[in-house]
Amino acid sequence: MASATEKRRYEVLRAIVADYIESQEPVGSKALLERHKLNVSSATIRNDMSVLESDGYIVQEHASSGRVPTEKGYRLFVDSIHDIKPLSLAERRAILGFLEGGVDLEDVLRRSVQLLSQLTHQAAVVQLPTLKTARVKHCEVVSLSPVRLLLVLITDTGRVDQRNVELDEPLEADQVTVLKDLLNGALAEKTLTDASEALQELSRNAPSDIRSTMEKCSGVLVATLVEQPSDRLILAGASNLTRLTRETAASVPMVLEALEEQVVMLKLLSNVTDLDHVTVHIGEENEDLQLRSASVVTTGYGSAGNTLGGLGVVGPTYMDYPGTISKVSAVARYVGRVLAGE
């Protein structure tokens, strides 16, 4: 159990972090006494700040300035957050109403990051559900010409993928119908990974008049949708990163590059598996070099207990952690409600 002195020093640190998040200006002992009810003398505050600095939680950037939190200080602050202030009823209604206006899954997710970027004043990202975990709802086969087909794959997550298939020989309308029925019989309710074997068997056993066409269609589906599923991100609010303080502005190009390349964020969001937990990576805790001057707050979204993907925000290390955690969690929860039709 922490001693009274340790508890007081944490309160001093909490006050420094809160003030710095609000002002982005170094915090001095005089300002702490004026702004916070710490109920101790200025000498005690200065001594506590000295100990916190020695322990690596705060740093004095210039001899005549106050202190600013270090990443270690932010980490202790975040780890000590137990009670997240809930959003107001008006905020919750506004979030749900905005998300319910989405016409499909991708539109709902696009709205979710627009909302998150506005609520947090950070860059917001969401990962579209990967085809690895999606189940096939329907496969539409459209004849574009006698020797060209369009395959439209629709999953239970609402994702739609389209692929063109060039044929070696013309296909009649009734053959297109047979092809569609066979594909749906093999794919319906299966994950695309599980469907790979079924597609290969389907090619071997298809009627002779459409066997070569079935082989081509199955090959396209297996090669592009099973073996190489395309993960995608939706990004909103990147311009928020350009409004940082002078001290952090130099790192903006690297962070923007990480967001634009998508690979870094896809890797991070792909590791999100928990619908009920918000993860915070601060500065050097981020594996990728491009994000080591930023903080990333992520959680999972989904429905019926299944995680479909990750969403979150990217911002400076001096972000409003309690508010950001609350808003990321709330938006993810309401995305799940909309997807579940609640």
UniProtKB/Swiss-Prot annotation:
Listed InterPro entries: GAF-like_dom_sf (IPR029016), HrcA (IPR002571), HrcA_C (IPR021153), WH-like_DNA-bd_sf (IPR036388), WH_DNA-bd_sf (IPR036390), WHTH_transcript_rep_HrcA_IDD (IPR023120)
Cystine pairs: none
UniProtKB keywords: Repressor, Stress response, Transcription, Transcription regulation
Any one Gene Ontology BP term: negative regulation of DNA-templated transcription
Source species, domain of life: Bacteria
Job of this protein: Negative regulator of class I heat shock genes (grpE-dnaK-dnaJ and groELS operons). Prevents heat-shock induction of these operons.
Family: Belongs to the HrcA family.
Protein name from the UniProt record: Heat-inducible transcription repressor HrcA
Organism whose genome encodes this protein: Corynebacterium efficiens (strain DSM 44549 / YS-314 / AJ 12310 / JCM 11189 / NBRC 100395)
UniProt lineage: Bacteria, Bacillati, Actinomycetota, Actinomycetes, Mycobacteriales
